[in-house]
Swiss-Prot record:
The keyword Transmembrane applies. Coiled coil: none annotated. Its main location: membrane. The keyword Translocase does not apply. InterPro entries: CD20-like. Residues 74-120 are extracellular. This is Membrane-spanning 4-domains subfamily A member 6E.
Amino acid sequence: MTSQPISNETIIMLPSNVINFSQAEKPEPTNQGQDSLKKRLQAKVKVIGVHSSLAGSILSALSALVGFILLSVNPAALNPASLQCKLDEKDIPTRLLLSYDYHSPYTMDCHRAKASLAGTLSLMLVSTVLEFCLAVLTAVLQWKQTV
């Protein structure tokens, strides 16, 4: 009395005085369960990716906001720095003071430094505002997509 498995059916052999039970339904292949598991895992990875992208957009917006605040305060410090440059200009050697000209190299250097610094800071400020707007827009769109 041995039992032998058959590929599509499961037969249980019992002693001769007991009834023979057979299973007519086909068992579910294990590949289908694995495919379902793969689909679920891929969906979970996609959801995690969307949430991490949303978090990245929010962090980008916050860092742009901090940069905007810092860059807004910096141009206010340009005038005291320019004044300091002009005060340092008066400490030049006495031989140059005799032929003092408004357009001396020291004065021109102060103006060039102030102009280049103001231009750089204003460009950084505009770029930071643009980054902030894009990051907020991206975060809002991703948030609406996940909800």
